[in-house]
Amino acid sequence: MGDRGGAGSSRRRRTGSRVSVQGGSGPKVEEDEVREAAVSPDLGAGGDAPAPAPAPAHTRDKDRQTSVGDGHWELRCHRLQDSLFSSDSGFSNYRGILNWCVVMLILSNARLSLENLIKYGILVDPIQVVSLFLKDPYSWPAPCLIIASNIFIVATFQIEKRLSVGALTEQMGLLLHVVNLATIICFPAAVALLVESITPVGSLFALASYSIIFLKLSSYRDVNLWCRQRRVKAKAVSAGKKVSGAAAQNTVSYPDNLTYRDLYYFIFAPTLCYELNFPRSPRIRKRFLLRRVLEMLFFTQLQVGLIQQWMVPTIQNSMKPFKDMDYSRIIERLLKLAVPNHLIWLIFFYWLFHSCLNAVAELLQFGDREFYRDWWNAESVTYFWQNWNIPVHKWCIRHFYKPMLRLGSNKWMARTGVFWASAFFHEYLVSIPLRMFRLWAFTAMMAQVPLAWIVNRFFQGNYGNAAVWVTLIIGQPVAVLMYVHDYYVLNYDAPVGA
């Protein structure tokens, strides 16, 4: 026993104050007594002082690791992971980079604006804007032309009124509608080409108004025709039975919709597609309307200022490279014009499709406010044209694309026909006000058909979106320079050459 006690004491000397966790009796009891005497010296005569509880295991481990200096997990500081810019990392928060892009864009444009002011001074002249609409203050051909459009609106109404009561046959009504709609296209064009006092800008506004009226009245004619066809089918099915109208007390049915009030509401409503019962908002929100009106005024002034201060000098400086056929300078002028042209186009989009159309819709309590969709996310040319101008897109689908399919055309022919109609109106709104026919706008629109195929075939995702943006940023300045160059040569350079 003495040997075992000596061995135990020597073991205690080697391990220091480390607590033994072995159980047992005999010599082990002596070790426990020695340990308790060392740890609890205050156990005295009374023996009633509580012994301190042993430290928890995790605390002892932590103390041991601190004293050693290196823990088990501190030996490893690397793990399997990808860099943030790698597609496999799953990281998507690039808000700081987006803010950096915005800051750089602001600084770059601020430098260009300062350079423009230093080079040209202040070119903004509100009085000059009036001269773009009127040559003679006593001759207002464009406003008079727009007022005269009421003749064709009334003619359409009278034709439909007589068709509803059977005073005209469908064939005669179709003939009268075709003549009326053709006159809507040809009459303002003839006035714009023959009347010398009308300005290009005034002619543009008049032709745009007549184009909108053409689309609206063609939709008005189609919907009323469909209502007559449905009425004939309903009579054949019901065999003269009257349908209860209790469920439709607040709706208008054909031919009760044939009133001047209904037609002129449609003429002023921000849509090209006619319905007998439009969705209506419950009230006019005055604050919303005031914001839209202020936006209209602000962005109108901003567009005029940017055109006069930024675009006009750039276009004027581009004429000499075009005359000399200096291709490097032409490309430089083209890229320089691309920035202000694209910025003005974006402002125009917001001004027209958000501010103006929402203001008109709020005044008329027109409920359908989907005037545009997320065209800026377009990954194809087709998606862009389907989403940037919803009123025109709805009209094309309803009154052009689907009727062509019903007549037996395939989808490719119908889609090409839609682009052809769009190309016609683009050329119509540009060539006639400028009084020259170069077909640049028509060619640019028809080029969208092969361009859409190329983008769909070779570009996907973000690359497709980038391709759409490139066509928007570069394509429009090319058309602008083409028309401005030809207009300049036709009106200013020809006498010098002669």
Swiss-Prot record:
Chain segments carrying region MBOAT fold? 140-498
**Annotated region (Intracellular loop 2 (IL2)), positions in chain:** 365-410
Cytoplasmic compartment ranges equal 1-92, 166-170, 233-284, 365-410, 459-460
Entry's EC annotation: 2.3.1.20, 2.3.1.76
Q: Provide ranges: composition bias, Basic and acidic residues.
A: 58-68
- Protein's GO biological process: diacylglycerol metabolic process; fatty acid homeostasis; glycerolipid metabolic process; insulin secretion; ketone body metabolic process; lipid storage; long-chain fatty-acyl-CoA metabolic process; monoacylglycerol biosynthetic process
**Annotated localization:** Endoplasmic reticulum membrane
List GO terms (cellular component aspect). endoplasmic reticulum membrane; intracellular membrane-bounded organelle; membrane
The main place the protein resides is: endoplasmic reticulum
The UniProt keyword set, sorted, is: Acyltransferase, Endoplasmic reticulum, Lipid metabolism, Membrane, Phosphoprotein, Transferase, Transmembrane, Transmembrane helix
Q: At the top level of its lineage, which domain of life is listed? A: Eukaryota
Pathway info: Lipid metabolism; glycerolipid metabolism
Q: Which positions in this protein are listed as binding an acyl-CoA?
A: 385-393, 401, 415, 488
The record's InterPro entries line, in alphabetical order, gives: Diacylglycerol_acylTrfase1 (IPR027251), MBOAT_fam (IPR004299), Oat_ACAT_DAG_ARE (IPR014371)
Where is the region Amphipathic helix (AH)?
Answer: 391-405
Ranges of the Lumenal topological domain: 128-139, 194-200, 320-326, 432-439, 493-498
- Annotated domain remarks: The disordered N-terminal region is required for the diacylglycerol O-acyltransferase activity and may regulate enzymatic function via its interaction with the MBOAT fold.
| Free-text function comment from the UniProt entry | Catalyzes the terminal and only committed step in triacylglycerol synthesis by using diacylglycerol and fatty acyl CoA as substrates. Highly expressed in epithelial cells of the small intestine and its activity is essential for the absorption of dietary fats. In liver, plays a role in esterifying exogenous fatty acids to glycerol, and is required to synthesize fat for storage. Also present in female mammary glands, where it produces fat in the milk. May be involved in VLDL (very low density lipoprotein) assembly. In contrast to DGAT2 it is not essential for survival.
User: What family is this protein classified in?
Assistant: Belongs to the membrane-bound acyltransferase family. Sterol o-acyltransferase subfamily.
Write the protein's name.
Diacylglycerol O-acyltransferase 1
Q: Which gene encodes it?
A: Dgat1
